[in-house]
């Protein structure tokens, strides 16, 4: 099988450039839908939950497999508009606040307007706060967004149309290096989405069918633990494709190989698979 790496790379970058924190994934799902249409896939539906499930007829209809990848990412939601015109946010998905300190962010309003800002500690300057700035724990309560607008009060912010509940996405810093490495946020799991699309493209380009009937599930709530929570009734086998942690303290994984996960924090996986 010849893998179209250029296609995978291009589609990965396209999808990474579409902000899709959990709960704000409609644009990413719409992109996937259009990509599938371009690949000749007509049999698909968008669930009430906002995920997309495609169906590809295979050589054997007596056995049905499903593969999945997720379009949702980590992000944040506006929790509070402060009196000083700054925003307190709550995390969406699990991440360390220190990993996004100083990050450029985009605030997505209900009216589809966007505003840029910076996520910083409430006491950011060492020149002003000394060791307090260095040693203060980075938590939801000690981090805030400074909006890139002339706002001094909560009323100023409200006039922009920014409200509690607005979604916040982080800058991705996507870089394609000459040696083949990719540096970016949200390779988990948008790279895997692109890989699945490349497999469908391979089938189309070579006029092939998968060995069995195939469901392809693009989920949108994986980062908070219920990405693929419902399966088609006739499903026999399910494989989730994800960017996992293979280089932990006690792991013997390899970042350049596929890993088959035996167990996560919730449950062991199926031995026969």
What are these regions (language model features)?
Residues 1-273:
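N-terminal hydrophobic/helix-forming segments and targeting peptides
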């Amino acid at each position: 099988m010849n893998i179209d790496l250029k296609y995978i790379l291009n589609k990965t970058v396209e999808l990474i450039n579409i902000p899709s924190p959990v709960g704000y994934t409609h644009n990413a799902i719409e992109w996937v839908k259009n990509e599938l249409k371009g690949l000749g896939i007509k049999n698909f539906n968008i669930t009430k939950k906002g995920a997309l499930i495609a169906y590809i007829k295979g050589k054997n209809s007596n056995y049905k497999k499903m593969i999945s990848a997720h379009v949702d990412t980590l992000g944040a939601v506006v929790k509070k508009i402060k009196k000083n015109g700054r925003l307190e946010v709550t995390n969406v998905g699990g991440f360390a606040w220190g990993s996004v300190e100083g990050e450029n962010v985009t605030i997505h309003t209900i009216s589809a307007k966007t505003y840029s800002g910076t996520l910083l500690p409430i006491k950011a300057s060492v020149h002003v706060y000394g060791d307090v700035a260095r040693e203060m724990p980075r938590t939801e309560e000690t981090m805030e967004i400074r909006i890139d607008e002339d706002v001094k009060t909560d009323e100023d912010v409200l006039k922009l149309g920014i409200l509690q509940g607005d979604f916040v996405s982080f800058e991705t810093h996507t870089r394609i290096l000459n040696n083949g490495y990719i540096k970016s946020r949200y390779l988990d799991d948008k790279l895997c989405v692109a890989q699945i699309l490349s497999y469908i493209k391979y089938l189309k380009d070579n006029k092939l069918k998968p060995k069995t009937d195939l469901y392809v599930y693009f989920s949108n709530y994986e980062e908070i633990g219920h990405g693929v929570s419902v399966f088609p009734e006739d499903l026999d086998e399910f494989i989730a494709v994800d960017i996992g942690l293979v280089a932990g303290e006690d792991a013997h994984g390899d970042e350049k190989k596929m890993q088959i996960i035996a167990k996560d924090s919730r449950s062991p996986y199926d031995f026969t698979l």
